[in-house]
Swiss-Prot record:
Homodimer. Component of a nuclear cell elongation controlling complex made of ILI5/BUL1, LO9-177 and BC1. Interacts with ILI5/BUL1 only in the presence of LO9-177. Interacts with IBH1. Binds to LO9-177 in the nucleus. Interacts with BCL1. The keyword ATP-binding does not apply. Transmembrane segments: none annotated. Keywords: Activator, Nucleus, Transcription, Transcription regulation. Disruption phenotype: Reduced plant height and grain size. Erected leaves, with reduced lamina joint adaxial and abaxial sclerenchyma cell length. Belongs to the bHLH protein family. It is found in: Nucleus. Transcription activator that contributes, together with LO9-177 and ILI5/BUL1, to the promotion of leaf inclination and grain size by modulating cell elongation. Involved in the RLI1-dependent modulation of leaf inclination by promoting lamina joint cell elongation, especially in response to phosphate (Pi) availability. InterPro entries: bHLH_dom (IPR011598), bHLH_ZIP_TF (IPR024097), HLH_DNA-bd_sf (IPR036638). A motif (Nuclear localization signal) lies at residues 109-116. This is Transcription factor BC1. Signal peptide: none annotated.
Amino acid sequence: MAGFSHLPQQMEHGLITNNGFLFCHGSHGGAATTTAPAIPEDASMETSSVVLDTSPQDKKRKPREEDTASLNSAHSKEAKENGRKRGGKKHSRDQMEEEAPQGFIHVRARRGQATDSHSLAERVRRERISERMRMLQALVPGCDKVTGKALILDEIINYVQSLQNQVEFLSMRIASLSPVLYGFGIDSDAFSDHSQKMEGMFHEAVAIPASVLNRGSSPAQSHAIMDTSNTSPTPYTLQVQGGSNNNSLSQDNGSYIMQTVGEPRQELFNQVVLNNYMCSFQ
């Protein structure tokens, strides 16, 4: 290093030679120190070359940069995958909303209420029960003022029982007023048909024997008179007038009395009429 003593001290950072470049470090007042290895004195300036030592910090920086690059790439991949998943979920939700059935009614749960299918079905059932209870309250008089399902049901039960008792009482009263219909088990329609048949039998019974009596009777002509009424309770009367003969047929509270006076032919006629009445009631 004795050959470089003639160089000025102002050059701190390096020296340019014909065949190489020499780095040196030092201050203005101190001796110059170099980081290059020692150069033998025999070596000439023309053939001398300085090999710089690379610091280990550069080697350490490379793997760190590679690690950070790999981490950044991994994070970017994860972010992309998460974005794809979120996009797929949003797309699937949109499809489900579009493909929802038309009859389905979306019920938005209130605060403190669940949204699962079981709770929704239970809520619908309770709403139906409340509607039926309102209808029953409207049917029962004075039941609108009652609160509580148990009390409402008690009022409804009592009202139905009272209606049942009234129906039974009315049916018993009707049966007591018309014992003929309920005693014999005859309906009102059947009873009206039966009365019409009886009237027809009366007309036939009166018309046929009257012609017979007119042929075999005395010169004094006999005639038949029949009084009928559907509304009044007056009895049916059959009178045959002629000479000293007199027959009468009367009805009093369902009992028929036959009074006969005269010849055997007239008695036979009266028996025929009575038999017809008896057959009609059997």
